[in-house]
C-alpha cells in the first residue's frame, strides 16, 4: 500500500441533540446528529404525535369546491 494517502483517523464522539454521546472513530473530529438510537421512536417504542389535523382541515377547505357537485336547478 502507498504511504501518506490515508486520511487521519481520530477517536471522536457522536453527539446527539438529546444529549447522548457515543464514542467511535472517524476521520472527523466531531460529529453532531439530530436523532440517535436513544431518542428515535423506532428504538424507544414511543411515538411522537404530529398535529396533522390542521393540515387536513386546510386541505379539505382548499379542495371542497372540487368535491361539491353542482346540481342543476330542476324546473317544475
Curated annotation (Swiss-Prot):
Its cofactor is Zn(2+). Belongs to the bacterial ribosomal protein bL31 family. Type A subfamily. This is Large ribosomal subunit protein bL31. GO terms for molecular function: metal ion binding; rRNA binding; structural constituent of ribosome. The keyword Ribosomal protein applies. Part of the 50S ribosomal subunit. One of its GO terms (cellular component) is ribosome. Keywords: Metal-binding, Ribonucleoprotein, Ribosomal protein, RNA-binding, rRNA-binding, Zinc. Zn(2+) binds at residues 16, 18, 36, 39. Binds the 23S rRNA. Pfam families: Ribosomal_L31. Binds 1 zinc ion per subunit. GO terms for biological process: translation.
Amino acid at each position: 500500500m502507498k504511504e501518506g494517502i490515508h486520511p487521519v483517523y481520530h477517536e471522536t464522539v457522536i453527539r446527539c441533540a438529546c444529549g447522548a454521546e457515543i464514542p467511535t472513530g472517524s476521520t472527523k473530529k466531531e460529529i453532531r446528529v439530530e436523532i440517535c438510537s436513544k431518542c428515535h421512536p423506532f428504538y424507544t417504542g414511543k411515538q411522537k404525535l404530529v398535529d396533522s389535523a390542521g393540515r387536513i382541515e386546510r386541505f379539505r377547505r382548499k379542495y371542497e369546491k372540487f368535491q361539491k357537485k353542482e346540481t342543476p336547478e330542476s324546473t317544475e
